[in-house]
Swiss-Prot record:
One of the record's GO molecular function terms: DNA ligase (ATP) activity
Species of provenance: Bdellovibrio phage phiMH2K
Name of a matching Pfam family: REP_ORF2-G2P
Active site, UniProt feature: 176, 180
Signal sequence, start to end: none
EC number: 3.1.21.-, 6.5.1.1
Function: Plays an essential role in viral DNA replication. Binds the origin of replication and cleaves the dsDNA replicative form I (RFI) and becomes covalently bound to it via phosphotyrosine bond, generating the dsDNA replicative form II (RFII). In turn, viral DNA replication initiates at the 3'-OH of the cleavage site. After one round of rolling circle synthesis, protein VP4 is linked to the newly synthesized ssDNA and joins the ends of the displaced strand to generate a circular single-stranded molecule ready to be packed into a virion.
Name under which the protein is recorded: Replication-associated protein VP4
Length: 315
């Protein structure tokens, strides 16, 4: 999806970059940046984070999708307390790397989202931890989708605030953790709760970096990433920034050829989706055929598209 409120920029007469349309020189090239705040931008960000997390999981033998909850005894606030998770991940790092030299320390990339229950508004954490799986994993239950869920005394002792359970890292679980970007925008204040969700990633180990370092040639020669179901997805912005920084000459070639072709195909698909969404909207209204303004049409299409992507991201 394309940004609906792009930030326009260009050059003034002296060659400086300016963002005011009044100051932009018409004789020089102008361009636009995604706002990163509108619904399409937020959904794109969530999707890109999910793709990067899934790719990160492919680079390690062991990964877990972990849920950390609070019991009544340790629920000291109805707000998320970042220090609780921060101390947990530090204890895990210390436990796994105790006695090891800096060169031999085990990297522990993670992506975490803290949110509130839909009904109880109770705070809890969902974490993707890469390059780790506890040795004492015990089967806990099987979900309706047939996925095995485990528990671990090792992790419980490190968490100290309540119950824990974990499963496998898949594109679905990665999408679940990455959904914060769309959810925060959709509900404003995390549904009816007046507290925002928290999202963070490991600072030392960029999510997806190992994957793009290994597969950048295939990825940028195609101009897209291949998802587990065989479908094609856009190359995440982080991958593009990495490629531009580390392979500037190849980036220029990609930007001039493959990226242009990918953009044209994406725009064609976007127009098709908009027509389909509008047709569905008209059908939903019972075939009523009274005039709609351009704004009403755009909002109708966005709402339909947003609902589809919410379902896809399991919002």
């Amino acid at each position: 999806m394309h940004c609906i409120r792009p930030i326009k920029a260009g050059f003034n007469a002296t060659g400086d970059i300016v963002y005011s349309s009044k100051k932009i020189s018409k004789e020089l090239a102008s361009f636009a940046f995604p706002c990163r705040k509108c619904i399409p931008c937020r959904l794109n960000m969530a999707r890109e984070k999910a793709i990067r997390a899934y790719h990160e999981s492919q680079m390690w033998d062991d990964n877990i999708f972990l849920t950390l909850t609070y019991d009544d005894e340790h629920l000291k606030s109805d707000r998320l307390q970042w220090i609780d998770f921060d101390l947990f991940i530090k204890r895990l790092n210390e436990k796994l790397n105790r006695g090891l030299s800096k060169e031999n320390r085990r990297p522990l990339p993670y992506m975490v989202t803290g949110e509130y229950g839909d009904k109880t508004k109770r705070p809890h954490w969902h974490v993707l931890i890469f390059n780790f799986r506890p040795d004492d994993a015990k089967k806990h239950y099987v979900t309706e989708l047939g996925e095995q869920v485990y528990t671990s005394e090792f992790i419980r002792d490190l968490w100290t605030h309540g119950n824990i359970e974990f499963g496998s890292v898949t594109l679905d679980s990665a999408s679940y953790v990455a959904r914060y970007a769309a959810k925060k925008l959709a509900h404003g204040n995390d549904q009816d709760h007046d507290y925002h969700p928290i999202h963070n990633t490991s600072k030392k180990h960029a999510i997806g970096k190992k994957w793009i370092e290994k597969y950048h040639e295939q990825t940028f020669s195609r101009g897209y990433v291949v998802l587990p179901n065989g479908s094609q997805g856009p190359i995440p912005r982080y991958y593009q920034d990495w490629y531009k920084k580390n392979h500037p000459e190849k980036w220029m070639e990609y930007d001039a050829k493959v990226k242009l072709k990918s953009k044209e195909l994406a725009e064609m698909q976007s127009r098709k989706d908009q027509l389909d969404d509008f047709a569905n909207f008209i059908n939903y209204r019972g075939g009523t055929n009274y005039p709609l303004s351009r704004t009403q049409v755009k909002l109708a299409i966005l709402k339909s598209k947003f609902k589809q992507l919410q379902e896809k991201l399991k919002l």
